[in-house]
């Protein structure tokens, strides 16, 4: 007696953002930090078109001249795969 098997499709992976960060410096001159991300926010049904957003932040922290103003940025991009 063979029972029917239920076959489910493999779930799509979550649309996780890409993160990039970095920094460096020394105690005398201060430290720079930077963080950027990219997130795809829309993809066409056929996967040929997509739109993404890219926010970011950077700042120079304590040094001989104090902290720099934080730099906040955001961008958007369109991609077409052919």
Swiss-Prot record:
It is found in: Secreted. Residues 1-32, 45-69 are annotated as: Disordered. It comes from the Eukaryota. GO terms for biological process: defense response to bacterium; innate immune response. One of its GO terms (cellular component) is extracellular region. Keywords: Amidation, Antibiotic, Antimicrobial, Immunity, Innate immunity, Secreted. Its main location: secreted. The keyword Secreted applies. The modification Phenylalanine amide is found at residue 82. Antimicrobial peptide required to resist Gram-negative bacterial infections, regulated by Dredd. There seems to be a family of diptericin in protophormia. Diptericin A is the predominant member. Belongs to the attacin/sarcotoxin-2 family. This is Diptericin-A.
């Amino acid at each position: 007696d063979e029972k029917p098997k239920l076959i489910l499709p493999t779930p799509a992976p979550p649309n996780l953002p890409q993160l990039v960060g970095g920094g460096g410096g020394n105690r005398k001159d201060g430290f720079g930090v930077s963080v950027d991300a990219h997130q795809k926010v829309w993809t066409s049904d056929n996967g040929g078109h997509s739109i993404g957003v890219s926010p970011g932040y950077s700042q120079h922290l304590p040094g001989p001249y104090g902290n720099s103003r934080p730099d906040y940025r955001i961008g958007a991009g369109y991609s077409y795969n052919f």
